[in-house]
Structures are given as structure tokens and as C-alpha cells.
């Protein structure tokens, strides 16, 4: 395994291998003074982020340092990209500095796959346009696996702007591979065409999705959708598709809740649902557990691509 640009064609055994290795790292991370073998001591990893990021960038940096690697932090606004340098030239110049891998966040779909044709080094997709975000999906699956033991037969629905979501796409591919039952819940204007061809259930009624599901992955609503003709208003979206305590209490169904962040509080999810880590109540938020698990999962990815 040389690159991780998506989960669309990643076989079951590779996903399971990454999740199993992440579990080993997570066990050590839980100790008071976690210590890891510096398996990547001589490696240099370029964190090339052409879009803003908090959780993904910092967790990759922490993951690399736990394994002994050094990181080069790249931001487009403070680089020669702002002077017109092409993506290809940027990658070639970083490779000339003898980096061993690229972690790429880019606004264009397919950018990570494009870069694999430019460099001989390993490429990890940290989110490209509306294409894929494989490490986010891996940490989501890892988090659910911690709670349920397996994703086989698990009912999981993804709520929100599916059409523009790279997180949704990677989760659909990965969870179907692991045997989960996947559903989408969204206004019809924010559903991509052809999803029903994958054997995915579609809900346009949030109450019905909650009654069906064991867990929900809530997506950040990109606020510009309200002015782009996709939604009547943010308020209308919150009424019909916002995950709230009141809705869960009315249905009386306990739900595990995930969200990739950042959160639009009181739009796609209420603060009470987002912040409740455990009962009482009809939901348990796994949001911060996802962030913690992101380190272990990204350690597993770096170890698999660079140390084996």
C-alpha cells in the first residue's frame, strides 16, 4: 500500500488492517505516558494544506511526531502558490527537499490522485474538494467499532449536505465494505444522483431515519447553501433536519452521534446533543472521541505507508 487517496476501491483486508493497527496505538495513547517506537525517525512528511484545517492537520502532525517523523507545515497563503506557482511545481519542489510523503488537503476534487502521478512519494488524501476524505471515514468507523464491536449489520445514517460532502462519500464506501447498512437523510436538493444504485436507503424524513438507525453521522451544513438555491433558509433546514434533544425525546430512540466538525450549533445539531457524552438523554455524542481516535488512525496510516 503506497498511497491512501480514497476508500472507493480499498479492499476489506486493508481497511481492517488499518483499524486493527489503530486499536494498538489507541491502547497506548490511553496510558498516562504513551511511548511509541520511533519507526519513522528518519522520515519527513509534508503537510500540504491548500485549505484551512484544525483537527485533520494537527492530528496528522501529532501522529507523525509520536512515530518519530518530522513535519513540514505548508499553507498556500504563505507560500509561492500565492504568487501563481502551480500545484505540480509545488509538489516537485517539496520532493526535491527529500520529503518522504505528502499529506494533501486541496479544494479541487481529484487533487490527491493527480499528485500520485507527479511524485514518487506516498500521498495521503486529507480531503480533496467534494471527492473523498478517507482518514475521516476511517476514524468514524473506528469510533463506531469501539462501541459496537463490528459494523456488520449496523444501521448508520448520514445527515446533511451529502451532495458536496467528501466525508459522506468516504464513509459510504468504507461502511458498505465493512458490512454496515448505510442510509442518507437530506433535503432532496442536497442528495447526489445515483446513490440509490449503491443499495443505500434514502430518507427525507429525519424522524424515520432516527427510528431506523443505531448511529448518525451529522455533516456540517455549508452556510452558503442557503443562498445558493439549495435551501429555502437555514432556519427551515434546522426545523426539518436539525438533530435536537426535543426530536430525540419525542421519538424516544437512543442514538450515537458523530460529527466531523466544525459544528454549526443550532443548525445541523443542537448544543445539548453535541455536548452530551453519556446518558441521561436519548443521545450520546462521540465528537471528542472522534478527535482522539483521529490520532491513532492517522498513526496507523503513516505507519502502514511509510514503515512497511
UniProtKB/Swiss-Prot annotation:
Pfam families: OTCace, OTCace_N
InterPro entries, sorted: Asp/Orn_carbamoyltranf_P-bd, Asp/Orn_carbamoylTrfase, Asp/Orn_carbamoylTrfase_sf, Asp_carbamoyltransf, Asp_carbamoyltransf_Asp/Orn-bd
Enzyme Commission number, as recorded: 2.1.3.2
Superkingdom classification of source: Bacteria
Residue numbers binding carbamoyl phosphate: 55-56, 105, 133, 136, 261-262
PROSITE patterns for the chain: CARBAMOYLTRANSFERASE (PS00097)
Pathway: Pyrimidine metabolism; UMP biosynthesis via de novo pathway; (S)-dihydroorotate from bicarbonate: step 2/3
GO CC, one annotated term: cytosol
Residues the entry annotates as binding L-aspartate: 83, 166, 220
Keyword vocabulary terms for this entry: Pyrimidine biosynthesis, Transferase
Catalytic activity: carbamoyl phosphate + L-aspartate = N-carbamoyl-L-aspartate + phosphate + H(+)
Keyword Transferase on entry: yes
Gene3D superfamilies: Aspartate/ornithine carbamoyltransferase
Molecular function GO labels: amino acid binding; aspartate carbamoyltransferase activity
Any GO BP annotation: 'de novo' pyrimidine nucleobase biosynthetic process
Subunit field text: Heterododecamer (2C3:3R2) of six catalytic PyrB chains organized as two trimers (C3), and six regulatory PyrI chains organized as three dimers (R2).
Protein family according to the UniProt entry: Belongs to the aspartate/ornithine carbamoyltransferase superfamily. ATCase family.
PANTHER family associated with the record: ASPARTATE CARBAMOYLTRANSFERASE, ORNITHINE CARBAMOYLTRANSFERASE, MITOCHONDRIAL
Function text: Catalyzes the condensation of carbamoyl phosphate and aspartate to form carbamoyl aspartate and inorganic phosphate, the committed step in the de novo pyrimidine nucleotide biosynthesis pathway.
Protein name: Aspartate carbamoyltransferase catalytic subunit
Source organism: Chlorobium phaeobacteroides (strain DSM 266 / SMG 266 / 2430)
Amino acid at each position: 500500500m503506497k498511497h491512501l487517496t480514497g476508500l472507493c476501491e480499498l479492499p476489506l483486508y486493508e481497511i481492517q488492517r488499518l483499524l486493527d493497527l489503530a486499536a494498538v496505538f489507541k491502547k497506548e495513547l490511553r496510558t498516562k505516558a504513551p511511548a511509541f517506537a520511533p519507526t519513522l525517525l528518519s522520515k519527513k512528511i509534508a503537510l500540504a494544506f491548500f485549505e484551512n484545517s484544525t483537527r485533520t492537520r494537527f492530528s496528522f502532525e501529532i501522529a507523525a511526531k509520536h512515530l518519530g517523523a518530522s513535519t513540514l507545515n505548508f499553507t498556500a497563503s504563505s507560500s509561492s502558490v500565492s504568487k501563481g506557482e502551480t500545484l505540480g511545481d509545488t509538489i516537485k519542489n517539496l520532493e526535491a527537499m527529500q520529503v518522504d510523503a505528502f499529506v494533501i488537503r486541496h479544494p479541487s476534487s481529484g487533487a490527491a490522485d493527480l499528485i500520485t502521478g507527479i511524485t514518487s512519494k506516498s500521498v495521503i488524501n486529507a480531503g480533496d474538494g467534494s471527492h473523498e476524505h478517507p482518514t475521516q471515514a476511517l476514524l468514524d468507523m473506528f469510533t463506531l467499532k469501539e462501541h459496537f464491536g463490528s459494523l456488520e449489520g449496523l444501521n448508520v445514517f448520514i445527515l446533511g449536505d451529502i451532495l458536496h460532502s467528501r466525508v459522506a462519500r468516504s464513509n459510504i464506501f468504507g461502511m458498505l465494505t465493512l458490512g454496515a447498512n448505510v442510509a442518507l437523510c437530506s433535503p432532496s436538493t442536497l442528495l447526489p444522483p445515483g446513490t440509490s444504485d449503491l443499495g443505500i436507503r434514502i430518507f427525507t424524513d429525519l424522524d424515520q431515519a432516527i427510528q431506523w438507525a443505531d448511529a448518525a453521522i451529522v455533516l456540517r451544513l455549508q452556510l452558503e447553501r442557503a443562498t445558493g438555491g439549495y435551501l429555502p433558509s437555514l432556519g427551515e433546514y434546522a426545523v426539518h433536519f436539525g438533530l435536537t434533544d426535543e426530536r430525540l425525546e419525542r421519538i424516544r430512540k437512543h442514538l450515537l452521534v458523530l460529527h466531523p466538525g466544525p459544528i454549526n450549533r443550532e443548525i445541523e445539531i443542537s448544543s445539548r446533543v453535541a455536548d452530551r457524552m453519556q446518558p441521561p438523554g436519548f443521545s450520546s455524542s462521540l465528537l471528542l472521541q472522534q478527535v482522539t481516535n483521529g490520532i491513532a488512525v492517522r498513526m496507523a496510516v503513516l505507519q502502514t505507508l511509510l514503515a512497511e
